Structures are given as structure tokens and as C-alpha cells.
Curated annotation (Swiss-Prot):
Major subcellular site: membrane
Any GO CC annotation of this UniProt entry: plasma membrane
Bilayer-spanning residue ranges: 15-35, 52-72, 98-118, 134-154, 164-184, 212-232, 246-266, 284-304, 336-356, 365-385, 394-414, 417-437
Protein name, as recorded: Probable potassium transport system protein Kup 2
InterPro entries, alphabetized: K+_transporter, K_trans_C, K_trans_N, Kup
One annotated GO molecular function: potassium ion transmembrane transporter activity
Catalytic activity of the protein: K(+)(in) + H(+)(in) = K(+)(out) + H(+)(out)
Highest rank taxon of the organism: Bacteria
Amino acid sequence: MMNESLTEKRNELSLSFAALGVVFGDIGTSPLYAFGQVIKYFPINDHNIYGILSLIFWSLIIIVSIKYLVIVFRADNDGEGGIIALAGVIRQKIKQPGGWLLFITLVGIGLIIGDGMLTPAISILSAVEGLESLSPNLAKYVLPVTLIILFFLFKMQSIGTGKIGVYFAPVMLVWFITIGILGFLQIIQNPKVLMAINPYYAINFFMIHKYFALFILGGVFLVMTGGEALFADLGHFGKKAIRTGWFAVALPALLLCYFGQGAFVLMHTEDIKYPFFSLSPDWFLPVMIILATLATIIASQAIISAAFSILKQASLLNLIPRLKIVFTSKFEKGEVYLPLINFILALGTCSLVVIFKSSSNLADAYGIAVNLDMLITTVLVGIIAYRCWSWHAFKILIFLLILIIELAFFAGNIPKLLTGGWIPILIAFLGFVVMYTWHCGFEKLRELHHRDALMDAFIIDELNQNKISRQPGMGLYIIDPYDCEGESLLHHLRLNRIFFENMVFVSIKIENKPYIPIEDKFELIKKAEGFYLIFIHYGFTENINLPNELDEMFKRVYLPFDIIKNKLIYFIEIVFVEMTGERQKHMYLWQKHFFSLMIRNAVPDIQFYQLPYNNTIAIGTYYQF
């Protein structure tokens, strides 16, 4: 029993250690730019620095430690976190939640795309800017070095991070220990800064500066960027490992670093461009720049991988067009590479670096996307607490308090809209337009298939009465998500009158859960003599390999005919959309053209379901929009 307990503890510590290299990369590198961004607005004196440090301390405690690690962690979807997981929990409880949930989900995904561009840009740029601390003459190399690092970062996505990923956690552990020690060395020289733990200084800061203090919250918010990753990566490491990593390593190191920067600037009141690098002794500065660059690369890798993961889930749920998905690891099922998304992120990130040129300028664009993402999380978890946990009104007030605090941060971020904050909003809006247009087009296809279902119902009767001649063999007809029960393929059979002796229609259903146990995965319905409908249920995080799944199904589900695997013939549908020029419900003409473009360029079923090319027949179907 004792050995089992020790083994369990070792496993938990191992997971906590691994989490350092993924979960805490973004929030762990915020000290590079966050504190310097805040202090530039005020003269350096005890009242201002204590007030800023107090705001930083209580922001990390209330929003990250209490909101995320205590409350939001309760809202996991079978151990999985993130906005799609939260939406899935709500859909399980509220069967028809309405358009508001779709709207929030699409906006949240759009913000994640923006975050995937901004995080690598500001993180790596802020690390390379340490060269200016070595020598002002090196300032001209900051931009090209940053772009070179970003180029190789996105280039290596196609080969995966399996081989180098094992070094992420050790590097981040060294990073946290280093910034903690550097901060501590400054605190012992000016220990009075620890008084800022008292919330009085945060309140006093607002009383002195009044409305202008609200503006500073936009800068303070930067210390929490990356906090949403703690919940998004829940499925990879679990609650206990992330909580241990945060409270034992990340949070103490961050607080020591921020308070150390506060102590340093109070002892050196001259203009300090990069207070973080000023903590480092001159002899250690080159090492610190290299370590900071490695840490920001790891932080950037984490957000890129998260973007791949969330967009893969969105693709499975048909929130976006089907994307080419490359699995870069034989051992880690969640390690995927999306070539198109990688290109978009790379182009966006490099463009941001060239346009803004410095981390200080980029900071204005950065915080607002994460702020909105956190607001969405608060709203969704509040709904879950009310509808799923049956929290009474008093407990729900906790969410109201958190919402007020986050809205105050959002108010502080609003002035940034004029100096770059509009960029993540624009990215999210463009992402929303793509996803909403795709959704509207899918709904139109569903409507057309419903009409076909009414026309083709008589085929079932003819099959039952043996009025249709059949040829030997078996056909597997893969039903698209917009097709309820294979009406389009049934319509094809009605037209050409080619019916196999045994026909199996296979429908893929993506559920609102991350994983579906094998015993609940398959569902067989006999529609007519020799005509079967099979539902295969997937979770939104699972990988689809239809031939492998069918092999498993044939072992578990009884079919009254023999299956010869190498002679199976798969039938899939290729959709062609023809424009009518008329405006239809929820779709303008430009949306119809855009949907037609997307569906033509989406990954075809044969790739998406990993079907054998030599045994697959594609049937083209035209639809009038």
C-alpha cells in the first residue's frame, strides 16, 4: 500500500514537472515585459510602486489562483478544459441552448487564433530585446534575430516537438528558479516592498489616481496573460499536477520576480527601459538573454500547439472547414500539425513583429484578446454553476465579483484599441466570419438533405418488399455530418439503380464529450433488408481513423453477412455548390460564394477519414444555394 502511494506521488510530481514546460510558459515569461509596461505611466515613488505591486499580487491570487485553479477547474468536461469543453458541458445540460452559445464559442476560438499570433511575437521579441541591455549598438539586430527565431519555430512544427519536448520542463524549471533568485536578491536589499501584499496599497493607488488608475489596469493585466492556458491544458496533465506546479513553483517565482523588479526600480529611480534585464548582473546578462529566449520559444510553442489542438477540435465539430491534420508523433495522440493554420500563424506573427517593432508597442495589442477570453470563460462557468451545480444566488455572487474585476481590466484595455488593441479584435472578427459562414452553409445543406429524405423514403419500402434488384457484394457509404441518415447517397442509388446485396451507411457523430468509451462507440440500426445504418460516436478530442474503427466495430457488432476487409468498397460524397443569386435566410450572396470556396478547398472525406484510396469511390453531388 505504501509503495502504491509513493508511486502515485512520484507520478504526480512527474506530471507537475512536465506541466512546467507547457502550461506555465506564457504566464511564466510575462515578467519580461509586464512590469516595465506598467511603470512607464507613473513617476517612480513608494506609493506608485507599492500600489502597482499590490495590484499584481492580488490579480494573480484572485483571477489565476482562485478563479481558475479553484472554481473553473471544477467545470472540466471529463477532465478536459478549454472553451469547447465548457460549451460541451452546457450542451449536455441544455439540449437547445440557442445561438448565444454558438456565438460565444466562435468568438472564443477567434480570440485563440489572435493569441496564437500575438504570444510568439511579444514573447520572443521581449527576450531578444535583452541585447540592447548588453549594448545599445545591438539594437539594430533585435528585429532580424526575432524574425529568424520565429521562422525556425514555425518551420519545425511539421516535424513535431517530440524529441526536443523532453527539454522544455527542465528549461522552464531553471527559468523559474533563476527569475525567483534574481528577484529575491533585490527584495533583501529593499524588503519594504513586501508591504505591497497589503491590499490597502492597491485601494490607495485608485484613491490617489482615480480614473487614470483604471487605465493602468490594462498594463497590470499583462501579468495574467497565459492564465487561461492553465485550464486549456487541463486534459494533458490533470488538476492536481497543474495546481502543484503553480503553487509550488510558478507563483512563488513570479511574485519574487515582480517584487524584485519593484525593489530595484525604487533603488534606481533613473529611467529604466528594461527593468527585468536590469535585475541581472552584467556578467550573467548574456546567459539570461539566452535563457529568456529559450523560455519564450517554449511559451510560444505551447500556444501554437494549443491553437492546433483547439482548431482540430473545431474541425471535428464542423465549426470550421475540414483541415489537413498531420500526426507528428506515434506515441502522443494529441500532438498534431495543421499546415494551413501554421502558415496563417507564421504570417500573422512575423507581420506583427515588423509592424510594431518592439514588445512595448505590441503590449497594447496583446492583453485585450486574453481579457475577452477570460470574460467568456467566466460567463460560461457561471452558467454551468447555476444550471449544472445548482449553486444558489449567494454563491453566484462570486462570479459577479470576478466579472466586475475582469470588466474593470477590460475598461483599462479599451484605450489600447487605438494603439493596436484593434488587431486581436479584427483577427477574432475575421475568424468569426469564416466560422459563422461555414455554419450557415452547413445548415442550408441540412435543410436540402431533409427534403431529399422525404423524396427517398419510398426506397426503404421497395427494399423491404424485394422490388429492387441487387448485385453481389457490400458497399460502405460514408455519410457527411450535414446528412442525417445518408439521404444524398440514397438519392444517388435511386437515380442509377445500383444496389449492393448488403449496404452499410456509416455516420460519424461527434459528441459533446472529449472521449467516448469503446462500449458506447457503436450503434447499429437495420433500416431495411440488407440495408444498415451504423453510428460511430467520437469525442471532440479523438483522432478519426475510420478503417481502424470499422475493424473494431466488426468485432463487437453482429452483422448477418460476412465481411471481407480487403474487398470493402467505400463510397463518399463530394459537394458542389451552385449559386442562385438569391438572398436566403441567414446567408447573403457573398457568404454563399465564400462557403462555396471553402467547401471546394476543404480536406476531402478520403483524407479526413483516412480511407484507402484504391477502395474508395467519390460521388459528386450538386446543390443549389
